């Protein structure tokens, strides 16, 4: 068997066989139970999301003993609709908030995640284990999370689909936090339709997460997905230095195929935008982590963000890439009424939303395509989805993201499904 899975629908027996045979070298599944042979869909959950009876470590020794007898709200939603997760996926330690030099997909607990396409390629991060698991046939889909590219980057690296929804579509209650303004669970899957199905299972209002107040109680993002033949325009963001030859070839194929199904792709400039991501996340993680640990900690973990930093300082010999990102957060005032923080939050989110709005308006477009990661949707709290469009000679995948405005999740999925369908034609 190949580590990269391209076969038919997975059975419990087959995925269990694949996990046992390949997980030791891919380091994608952190914990798992025997999957239910009667289940029609098999889902894993990123290891920063609380699941009853399983640890929620975020890849960190500090949280090795963090085990709850309750589910995160989004997991409760999924269970209420008959889907029960059977395990946890590995991830970049603390969702990448440990060090700026740490490789994507690495954690002390989970080791280095390996891309099933080629071990020399990055798996991306921080939802590395989710994308590796989907690509390797360890599950049908995986619940992942994103603050700043953590769903779409590994999805593009591993050649799968990954959607980060509008912040507020899915509750963050019971998820190890970085930023309440930007964090969200999302979906990693083999197809756009599977991603839409998982998002529909996870979505819904939660009284403990005010960002979800505008989310419908019973959201269905799958009905008639990708079946529309209505002509649409999509803006392609072009960097100042353009695209390399292999990207150009993949894009030319994409543009030509899209023309056959009434999707016109027009070029638009990729603008440089000040997001203030570092200040926003460094400020918010301090109070957000304090709150999470007070509600979900169990006495065997640090009880505050400062204690978490101290835990790492006392074990610096175990962290070959340092802890500069984690320590650096302490340089920022955690007070959410601080004017510098408020100005950065307002300016950063508005800059990104305006970049999306202006691009759509100027190009008279319905959505926007970017090659690789562009932070507009992460900091603008808006939806975008990653899918593969080609592959380089060195086997590295060429991926795009498709994004739109806040709460246009259905539109993003529909356009992605139409594009996916034409790319899959012979």
What is each residue range found by the language model?
Residues 1-67, 72, 91-96, 214:
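Short, well-ordered alpha-helical
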Residues 1-31, 53, 252-262, 310, ...:
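An N-terminal boundary/leader segment
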Residues 11, 243-269, 290-312, 345-362:
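Acyltransferase
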Residues 15, 195, 234, 258, ...:
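Residue-level signal for inorganic ion chemistry
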Residues 28-31, 164-252, 425-426:
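A short helix-breaking turn/cap at a secondary-structure junction
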Residues 40-61, 231-233, 283-350, 388, ...:
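Short helix-loop capping/hinge segments that flank enzyme active sites or metal/cofactor-binding pockets
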Residues 46, 80, 84, 139, ...:
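Glycine-rich, small-residue loops and helix-cap segments
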Residues 72, 79-202, 382-390, 396-399:
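Short glycine/serine-rich loop segments
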């Amino acid at each position: 068997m190949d580590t990269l899975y391209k076969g038919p629908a997975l059975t419990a027996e087959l995925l269990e066989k694949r996990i046992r045979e390949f997980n030791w070298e891919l380091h994608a599944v952190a914990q798992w139970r025997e999957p239910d042979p009667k289940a029609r869909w098999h889902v894993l959950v990123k290891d920063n999301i609380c699941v009853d009876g399983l640890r929620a470590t975020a890849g960190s020794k500090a949280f090795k003993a963090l085990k709850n007898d309750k589910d995160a709200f989004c997991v409760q939603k999924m269970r209420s609709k008959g889907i029960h997760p059977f395990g946890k996926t590995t991830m970049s330690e603390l969702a990448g908030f440990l060090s700026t030099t740490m490789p994507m997909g690495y954690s002390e607990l989970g080791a280095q995640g390996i891309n099933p396409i080629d071990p020399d390629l990055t798996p991306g991060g921080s939802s590395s284990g989710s994308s590796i698991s989907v690509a390797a046939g360890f599950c049908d889909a995986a619940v992942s999370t994103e603050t700043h590219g953590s769903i779409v980057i590994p999805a593009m690296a591993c050649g799968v689909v990954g959607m980060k929804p509008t912040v507020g579509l899915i509750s963050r209650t019971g998820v190890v936090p970085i930023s309440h303004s930007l964090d969200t669970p999302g979906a990693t899957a083999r197809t756009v339709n599977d991603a839409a199905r998982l998002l529909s299972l996870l979505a819904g209002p939660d009284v403990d997460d005010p960002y979800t107040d505008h989310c419908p109680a019973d959201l269905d993002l799958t009905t008639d997905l990708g079946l529309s033949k209505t002509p649409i325009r999509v803006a392609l963001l072009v960097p100042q230095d353009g695209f390399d030859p292999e990207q150009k070839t993949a894009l030319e194929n994409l543009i030509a195929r899209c023309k056959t199904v009434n999707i016109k792709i027009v070029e638009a400039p990729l603008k440089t935008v000040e997001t203030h991501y570092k200040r926003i996340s460094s400020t918010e993680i301090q109070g957000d982590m304090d709150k999470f640990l007070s509600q979900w900690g169990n006495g065997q973990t640090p009880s505050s963000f400062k204690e978490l930093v101290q835990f790492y300082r006392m074990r610096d010999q175990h962290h070959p890439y340092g802890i500069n990102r984690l320590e650096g957060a302490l340089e920022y005032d955690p007070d959410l009424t601080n004017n510098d923080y408020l100005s950065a939050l307002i300016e950063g989110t508005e800059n990104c939303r305006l970049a999306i709005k202006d691009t759509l308006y100027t190009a008279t477009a319905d959505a926007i395509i970017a090659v690789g990661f562009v932070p507009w949707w992460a900091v603008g709290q808006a939806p975008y989805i990653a899918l593969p469009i080609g592959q380089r000679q060195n086997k590295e995948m060429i991926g795009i993201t498709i994004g739109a405005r806040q709460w246009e999740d259905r539109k993003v999925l529909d356009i992605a499904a139409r594009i996916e369908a034409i790319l899959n034609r012979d």
